[in-house]
């Protein structure tokens, strides 16, 4: 499967899932993005169009992490959960953004659940 086909497939899945996955202020959308090297997570309120909380492997304390990308993704999940709980958010809607629920995506979700987010 060519790279163009993979990108088009992911975009179709992303568009299809966005219909049913909507975030509100009380239950925001946990949106993730996975690049080849990094992992990003955001809590988004779609009603007001605001990003409430962010976490990624690009932060200073995560840049020095030496381990696997899956371990780094788990830490990002724990960090987003800690920031969300500090902001008074416990329930979220998980948006995998067209990525398969496997590997780093699953590790981030598991880390967020371990730290106290409910989804």
Curated annotation (Swiss-Prot):
It comes from the Bacteria. Gene3D superfamilies: 3.30.420.100. One of its GO terms (cellular component) is ribosome. Residues 1-23 are annotated as: Disordered. CDD domains: Ribosomal_L18_L5e (cd00432). InterPro entries: Ribosomal_uL18_bac-type, Ribosomal_uL18_bac/euk. GO terms for biological process: translation. Pfam families: Ribosomal_L18p. Keywords: Ribonucleoprotein, Ribosomal protein, RNA-binding, rRNA-binding. The keyword rRNA-binding applies. GO terms for molecular function: 5S rRNA binding; structural constituent of ribosome. HAMAP family: Ribosomal_uL18_B. Part of the 50S ribosomal subunit; part of the 5S rRNA/L5/L18/L25 subcomplex. Contacts the 5S and 23S rRNAs. PANTHER family: 39S RIBOSOMAL PROTEIN L18, MITOCHONDRIAL, LARGE RIBOSOMAL SUBUNIT PROTEIN UL18M. This is one of the proteins that bind and probably mediate the attachment of the 5S RNA into the large ribosomal subunit, where it forms part of the central protuberance. Belongs to the universal ribosomal protein uL18 family. This is Large ribosomal subunit protein uL18.
């Amino acid at each position: 499967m060519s790279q163009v086909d993979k990108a088009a497939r992911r975009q179709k899945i992303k568009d299809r899932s966005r219909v049913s996955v909507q975030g509100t202020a009380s239950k925001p959308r946990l949106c993730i993005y996975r690049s080849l090297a990094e992992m990003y997570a955001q809590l988004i309120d779609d009603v007001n169009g605001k990003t409430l909380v962010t976490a990624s492997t690009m932060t200073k304390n995560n840049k020095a992490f030496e381990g696997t990308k899956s371990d780094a993704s788990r830490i990002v999940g724990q960090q987003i959960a800690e920031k969300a709980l500090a902001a008074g958010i416990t329930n979220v809607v998980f948006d995998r953004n067209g990525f398969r629920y496997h590997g780093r995506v699953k590790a981030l979700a598991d880390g967020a659940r371990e730290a106290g987010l409910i989804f």
